[in-house]
Amino acid sequence: MVFADGFNSLASGIGAGLLVRDHKVWYACIPHLWQLHDKDRDGKAESRQSLHYGYGVHVGYLGHDLHGLCLGPDGKLYFSIGDRGLSVETPDIRIDHPDSGAILRCNLDGSNLELYATGLRNPQELAFDNYGNLFTVDNNSDSGDQARLVHVVEGGDSGWRIGYQFINNPQPRGPWNSEKLWHPHFPGQAAYIVPPLANISNGPSGLSFYPGTGLDDRFNNHFFLCDFRGSAAISGIHSFAVTPSGASFKISDFQPFIWNILATDIDFGTAGEIYVSDWVQGWAKPAKGRIYRIYDPTARNNDKVREAHQILAGSLSEYPTDALGKLLQHSDRRVRQESQFELVTRNQSSLPLLLEIAIKGNDLLARIHAIWGLGQIAQQEVIPSILDPLQTLITDRNDEIRAQIARVMGDSQYGQGVDSLKKLLQDPSNRVRFFAANSLGKLKPDHAIEDLFTLIRENDNRDPYLRHAGVMGLVGTADVKSLLGAGKDPSSALRLAIVLTLRKKKDPAVSHFLNDPDPAVVLEAARAIYDTPISESLPQLASIITRHDLP
C-alpha cells in the first residue's frame, strides 16, 4: 500500500527521514519538510502540508539531504541537513545557511524553527541519550580525514564548509585538513569550533540509542552505529557508550555488534527486537534491499519487554495521572518519554504530580522527565512561574538534577532564575556550569557579564565545551562596549572568548584583536574576519601581513 506519493519534482531530493506519531507522518524530502496526515486511519494520507520549504539550495553529493528526524526531550522535532544547505523562511524567521550541514529544531507544527548547530558535512542520523544529550556521527570527506562522533550542542560549529570539498591545493580540503578541524580537542586547535569527541567508523549512517528493553543489560546507555563501507565483508554495526568528561563526554566500550552486513539504518521495535535495513552490496543502487528483524530470545520474553510493548501499543491517554507518574521510572525510555508527553498534554492538572516527582522523587530518570515536563508546560503556557518551586533544586546533591534545572530555566525563559544560574556558574560540575552559562545567554541579564568572565578565566581554555557555553552566555548578555572594555584583560582565555563572541555577533569590532599580544588571539580574530566573513574588517586583516611576530 502506498501511503503518499508525488514527491518527484525536479528539485526533490531523496526521501530520507520519517517520523510517525498520532497518525501523522513527518517526511523529510528536499526541498520540503512535510507533514502527512492519515485522518481516517486507512493507511493512506488524506492531507499533506509543507511545514518548511527551502532545504538543499545547491547541488551536492548524493544523499547530503534532509534526514535524522527525531523527538527531543523538550517535545520538539529535531532533524539534520547535509551540506547542501538551506534558505528557509517561515512566518517567524528567515534562516539562510548555504555552506554547511546543520541541525535544526522546531515545534511539531513547524513553528519556532531554530538553527541549532552548524559546520557539519552530512549528519545522517541523530540520537538522544537518557539525559537529553544529542549526538550524531558525521561523515568524512574522503581525503585522509575521519568521521566524527559529535556531541551536538546549541550554537556549536563543527567547522566544515562545503567549499572545502573542492580544494586540492596547496592541501586537499584546505583548512579542514591543514588546521585539523576534524580532530578531537588538542591544545592550540581552532577555538571557534566545538571539537568532536572521537574519530569513529568510515561510513556512518544509521544511529540509534538503546531504549532500555530487549537486550542484555550490558547495552544500557549504549548507541548503535551503522558503518557503511560499500561491501558487506567490511561493514556492520558498532555499539559504544559515552562517559562524562568535563562539560561533555568521551567514548567508551566501542565494539562490533553485528558484522558482515551493509547496514544503512538500525531501529528498536517495541517488542524487544531490532530492525536493520540492508543495502546488500556495493556503492551503486542495487535495485534491491532487505530488512532484518533481530532479537535476543531470553531478553525478549522478560516482563519489562512485554509491559513496554503493551504500553506503547496502547493509548496513554486512558491512564490515570498517578499511573503516568509511576511510568516515568520505567526501564524503557520510550515509555518514560511518552508518559512525560501525555502528562504535558494534561497541562496544569499534572503540575502537582510533576513537582512532587521532580523535588521529592527517588528515581533519577523519573525526576529528570518530570523537570523536562514542567519545562514544556512552562513554555507552552508561557507561565515561567510554574518553575518557582524548582529553585530549591539548585543545591540538589545530584549533579544531573542541577544541570537539568539550569537547562530548563533557560529554555523556559525563566527570568526569576537568573540569580540561581549565576550561582550555578560556580558549581563544582562543569556540566552544570555549561547549562548555567548557556541559559544566561538566553535570559540576557547584563549583570551576569562579570560572572561569565570569571567562568571563562577559570576555565582557561581547558574545556572547549565550557568555553563555548561561556561564549553563548556572552552572546546573549554582553554588548560590544562591554566586550571591548575587557579587551585588555590579563587573561588571554577571556580575550579569546571575546573574539569568539564578536565572531558570532559578526561585529567588525573583532578587528581590535588583530593587535593582541597573544598570537593565538590574533589568529582567531583573523579567522573570524575571513571566514564569517566580516567585510568591513578585511582591510585591517590585510594590513598585518607585514608583521613578522605572527606564525
Model feature map: region roles:
Residues 325, 340, 355, 371, ...:
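Hydrophobic core positions within HEAT/HEAT-like alpha-solenoid repeats
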Residues 317-326, 347-359, 379-395, 413-426, ...:
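Amphipathic alpha-helical scaffolding segments comprising HEAT/armadillo-like alpha-solenoid repeats
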Residues 267-272, 317-318, 328-346, 372-379, ...:
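C-terminal substrate/ligand-recognition segments
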Residues 342-345, 373-376, 408-411, 415, ...:
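Core register positions within helices of long alpha-helical scaffolds
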Residues 1-323, 344:
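Beta-propeller domains with acidic blade repeats across secreted/periplasmic ectodomains
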Residues 336-337, 365-368, 403-404, 419, ...:
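Alpha-solenoid HEAT/ARM repeat scaffold
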Residues 93, 116, 139, 193-198, ...:
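Hydrophobic alpha-helical scaffolding
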Residues 333-334, 363-365, 399-400, 415, ...:
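Alpha-helix N-cap/helix-start positions at coil->helix boundaries
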